[in-house]
A protein has these predicted regions:
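Charged, cofactor-coupling segments
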Residues: 2-4, 10-93
Length: 93
């Protein structure tokens, strides 16, 4: 399953495409809108995806919609320092 897709007229607009296929080789440029949607799947039990709608602004990924994560559901011991820093910066916005 891909990790995201473009946003536009179609449900899965291209480019960009965040996956292993050829479309994923297209560089994300300023003003492109796309999703970042990592997922976790536990075979035979469940799957969950967190989708964040974003756009590229001056070479930096910016969220279109801002909703904080429920921190009590995050196991911070599984995050590296860069991930913790990103989460803290995201929460401040």
């Amino acid at each position: 399953h891909g990790l995201g897709h473009g946003i536009g007229v179609s449900v899965h607009e291209y480019p960009p495409n965040l996956s292993k296929n050829e479309m994923a080789k297209i560089e994300i440029k300023d003003n492109m809108c796309f999703t970042i949607e990592p997922g976790l799947y536990n075979e035979k039990h469940f799957g969950i995806r967190l989708e964040n709608s974003c756009y590229m602004k001056k070479g930096k990924i910016t969220s279109l919609v801002h909703m904080n994560y429920e921190k009590k559901l995050i196991d911070f011991s599984m995050l590296n320092e860069q991930e913790k820093e990103w989460l803290n910066e995201f929460e401040v916005l």
